[in-house]
């Protein structure tokens, strides 16, 4: 009996072994055809060809992968891939093949003649959620590429984001503020296929404890990632090289966004003209205003800067060698507490060549100067910070310790009217700490804030002329502190608060110069300024129905202690400054609101201009200060209207601002031999400014695109003393821009942008008017030849008026092609400045000057590169 049992057991084991041996595992990855992003939740059925009978089934994971085991012979069977909102796909199976990847396409579901699609914008209260997939295209790489296509969102050349004309006050990733004020690091480096939605938090109050107490008119953005991009390492790698001249580009990003920790690290290097240092720019201004400011910056007494271009894309002229590295980390150390660190370094080396003609308009003559310059700049920046933040409904605490170090070197060879060579060394060092504490108990809130900073600018300038050498040294340093405490009460619908503060400044400046003619005046300075400012700032807010009103009446008392250490002379003074302001907003409906604001202010005294000796700012400009405690008086009034229909992808706003100022000091400019002496003249002058503009953006659902129109106008009336004569002038600037992005066909994307501007200056005392008109156009066309093969043709056209009868035309064209393999590797070939255009020219106006400038462009570049997103 036992023998029979053994035989039976052995037979069953053999059958099981054969069965296991015949088991086959089918694997693969399912992606969206348009964006190559992985699809989760796709049902994968194994079935017989021509039959509805399902043999096996499974679902794809978060990364789009699937596994399906079967012992059924593969021949004669097929895999069926299905997901709501996507076209069902079928693959026939072959013996010996176990890897089956699939690309799926989106498909609308028609139910009783109603097409069901995910909306491109959803609204939940004050939050607008933009569905990234509705705006993205296979040609888009970074999140910034997609943001530019979203109605209501504006992205400037620097990367600054505005929503319906208002700048952001916060930028979050999954609800956490890892990057502080440098959100370019996220928008330019996070791949758009990793992002599910962009949430715009309108009227965002970043301090939770003040959520129902103090209103905010500023928006914030929160990035919501796809599940497949969370809690794992994702990133991109790009490398390329080319010729004419030898060019390279390399980039690597690595990031991970988990529930309790986030990291975003980047490494970039190129010489193709792309300014990757913009990633590190501070884009959110949270330093306050007027004498309540939490910041203080030293003046650059030496100011040697190569000519900068207007209008044209910066990457057309940047002849660079740039390297950057950033390391950004955040850890959740408590339920509502985060610890974040940031380390940034950049090296940017630029060379440039330009020529210019400057006309200085005087009451009785015009002075012309010609410059031909070849410049080389080297800029090294190192920034580091560590921040601890707690944000709850009862407690807000943050402390950020930062350091910002810069080493800026400039060398300029100048030919023309005044040939010379300038060598400037302008390092800058700053260490600062920001502490904020808010405690809320019931209907009241207590705060204590403190900002402290030490900074130093030891600058030098060497000017070599045919007739001699000049050297200027200017060293300034300062300690600045602003601490305040406040108590606020919330008595619905009112909130009243009182802030008390103390500002301390201790600053010194020492300068020496050699080689400057004695006839021009004293060329040495050694001064010190100290002040202790106490201030009180009562504020009241009202919010009820559609009304929001804010009234503020800050008052400060400041004793100043100024000493000229060269002559051991003191000039002390005390001053009271009152700066009332009002803000009013009325929400007519969920779509339409009006805002009105006004202020009367006494501007901050320009105490960094308190010196008597001359300082050589550049090869031609000599600056001298003026010890005067009179402050500029100002008034402003601003009115704006906002309109939006988020579900119809329509956003619009209109604004108008009027401002007036009165000063007892007038800027003075004197021409003496080879120099321009810039100073101040004790004479009361008035100036005023008009600013107005409008913006509108509308999504084009049928064409899967957007159209936007914006226009701005500014008019300034002022005066300037030149050679002891007062000159009145008016400058005007008007521009209008239209942008269109459309997909007329599935395989075609088109972008077009046109800008027209008019700039003019009127010299009232001699009745002379000069103006210039400029037109710029940008166009790009993306053609998907196949699902993986892309062609792109783009161009820029500029028509700039150089004089009354002379216009400069410039056409720049680019061509690129790329091919993306199944696993996401992309090979591309780019040709920039296809026709190898040489120069760009334009005319501009400022401070009774007309400047005609011509700049050398980058030559034709041919670059081959490989890109991979993981």
List the predicted regions and their residue ranges.
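Structural motif
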Residues: 29-40
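Short, acidic Ser/Thr/Gly-rich low-complexity loop/linker segments typical of extracellular
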Residues: 50-65
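Face-selective signature of the C-terminal outer-membrane beta-barrel domain
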Residues: 330-348, 377-415, 419-564, 587, ...
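Conserved C-terminal beta-signal and adjacent last beta-strands/turns
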Residues: 735-756, 766-870
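A short, solvent-exposed loop/turn motif at the edges and junctions
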Residues: 47-53, 75-91
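Outer-membrane beta-barrel translocator domains and adjoining extracellular loop/strand segments
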Residues: 211-212, 276-282, 351-368, 401, ...
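Membrane-proximal, glycine/serine-rich, low-complexity loop/turn segments characteristic
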Residues: 22-23, 63-67, 87, 94-98, ...
């Amino acid at each position: 009996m036992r023998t029979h049992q053994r035989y039976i057991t052995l037979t069953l084991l053999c059958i099981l072994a054969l069965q296991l041996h015949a088991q086959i595992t089918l694997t693969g990855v399912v992606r969206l055809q348009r964006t190559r992003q992985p699809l989760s939740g796709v049902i994968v059925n194994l079935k017989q060809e021509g039959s509805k009978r399902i043999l096996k089934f499974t679902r794809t994971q978060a990364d789009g992968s699937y596994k399906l085991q079967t012992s059924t012979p593969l021949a004669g069977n097929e895999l069926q891939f299905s997901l709501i909102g996507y076209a069902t796909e079928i693959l026939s199976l072959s013996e010996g093949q176990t890897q089956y990847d699939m690309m799926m396409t989106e498909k609308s579901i028609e139910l009783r003649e109603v097409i069901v699609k995910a909306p491109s914008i959803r609204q939940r209260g004050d939050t607008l959620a933009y569905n990234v997939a509705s705006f993205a295209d296979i040609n888009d790489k970074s999140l910034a590429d997609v943001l530019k296509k979203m109605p209501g969102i504006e992205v400037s050349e620097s990367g600054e984001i505005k929503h319906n004309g208002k700048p952001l006050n916060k930028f979050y990733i999954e609800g956490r503020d890892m990057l502080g004020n440098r959100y370019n690091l996220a928008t330019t480096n996070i791949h758009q296929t990793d992002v599910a939605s962009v949430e715009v938090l309108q009227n965002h109050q970043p301090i939770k404890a003040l959520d129902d107490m103090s209103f905010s008119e500023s928006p914030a953005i929160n990035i919501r990632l796809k599940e497949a991009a969370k809690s794992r390492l994702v990133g991109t790698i790009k490398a390329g090289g080319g010729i004419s001249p030898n060019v390279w580009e390399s980039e690597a990003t690595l990031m991970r966004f988990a529930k309790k920790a986030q990291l975003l690290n980047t490494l970039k290097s190129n010489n193709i003209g792309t300014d990757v240092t913009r990633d590190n720019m501070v884009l959110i201004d949270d330093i306050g205003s007027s004498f309540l400011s939490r910041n203080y910056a030293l003046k650059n007494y030496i100011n040697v800067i190569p000519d900068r271009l207007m209008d044209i894309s910066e990457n057309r002229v940047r002849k660079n060698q740039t390297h950057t590295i950033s390391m950004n980390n955040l850890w959740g150390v408590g339920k509502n507490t985060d610890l974040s660190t940031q380390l940034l370094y950049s090296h940017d080396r630029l060379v440039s060549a330009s020529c210019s003609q400057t006309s200085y308009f005087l009451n009785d003559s015009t002075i012309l100067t010609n410059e031909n310059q070849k410049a080389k700049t080297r800029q090294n920046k190192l920034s580091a910070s560590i921040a601890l933040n707690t944000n709850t409904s009862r407690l807000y605490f943050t402390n950020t310790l930062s350091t910002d170090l810069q080493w800026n070197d400039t060398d300029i060879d100048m030919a023309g009217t005044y040939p010379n060579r300038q060598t400037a060394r302008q390092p800058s060092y700053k260490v600062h700490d920001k502490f904020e504490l808010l405690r809320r108990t019931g209907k009241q809130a207590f705060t204590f804030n403190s900002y402290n900073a030490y900074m130093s600018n030891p600058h030098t300038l060497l000017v070599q002329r045919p007739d001699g050498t000049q050297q200027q040294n200017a060293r300034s340093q300062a300690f600045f502190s602003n601490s305040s405490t406040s108590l606020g009460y919330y008595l619905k619908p009112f909130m009243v608060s009182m802030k008390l503060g103390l500002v301390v400044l201790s600053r010194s400046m020492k300068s020496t110069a050699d080689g400057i003619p004695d006839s021009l005046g004293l060329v040495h300075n050694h001064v010190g300024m100290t002040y202790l400012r106490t201030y009180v700032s009562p504020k009241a807010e009202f919010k009820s129905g559609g009304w929001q009103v804010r009234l503020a009446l800050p008052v400060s008392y400041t004793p100043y202690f100024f000493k000229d250490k060269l002559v051991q002379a003191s000039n002390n003074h005390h001053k009271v400054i009152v700066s009332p302001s009002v803000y009013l907003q009325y929400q007519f409906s969920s779509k339409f609101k009006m805002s009105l604001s006004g202020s009367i202010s006494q501007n901050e005294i320009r105490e960094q201009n308190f010196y008597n000796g001359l300082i050589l700012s550049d090869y031609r400009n000599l600056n001298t200060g003026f010890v005067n405690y009179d402050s500029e008086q100002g008034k402003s009034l601003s009115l704006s209207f906002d309109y939006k229909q988020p579900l119809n992808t329509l956003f619009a706003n209109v604004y108008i601002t009027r401002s007036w100022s009165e000063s007892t000091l007038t800027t003075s400019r004197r021409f003496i031999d080879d120099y321009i002496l810039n100073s101040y003249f004790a004479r009361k002058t008035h100036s005023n400014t008009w600013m107005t503009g409008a913006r509108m953006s509308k999504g084009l659902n049928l064409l899967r695109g957007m159209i936007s129109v914006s226009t701005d106008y500014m008019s300034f009336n002022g005066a300037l003393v030149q050679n002891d004569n007062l000159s009145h002038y008016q400058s005007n600037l008007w521009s209008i821009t239209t942008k269109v992005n459309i997909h007329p066909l599935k395989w075609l994307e088109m972008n077009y942008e046109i800008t027209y501007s008019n700039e003019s200056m009127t010299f009232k005392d001699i009745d002379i008017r000069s103006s210039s008109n400029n037109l710029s156009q940008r166009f790009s066309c993306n053609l998907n030849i196949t699902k993986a093969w892309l062609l792109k043709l783009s161009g820029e056209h500029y028509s700039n008026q150089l004089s009354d009868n002379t216009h400069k035309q410039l056409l720049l064209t680019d061509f690129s092609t790329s091919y993306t393999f199944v696993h996401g590797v992309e090979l591309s070939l780019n040709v920039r400045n296809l026709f190898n255009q040489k120069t760009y020219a334009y005319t501009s106006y400022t401070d009774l000057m007309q400047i005609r400038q011509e700049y050398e462009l980058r030559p034709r570049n041919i670059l081959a590169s490989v890109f991979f997103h993981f």
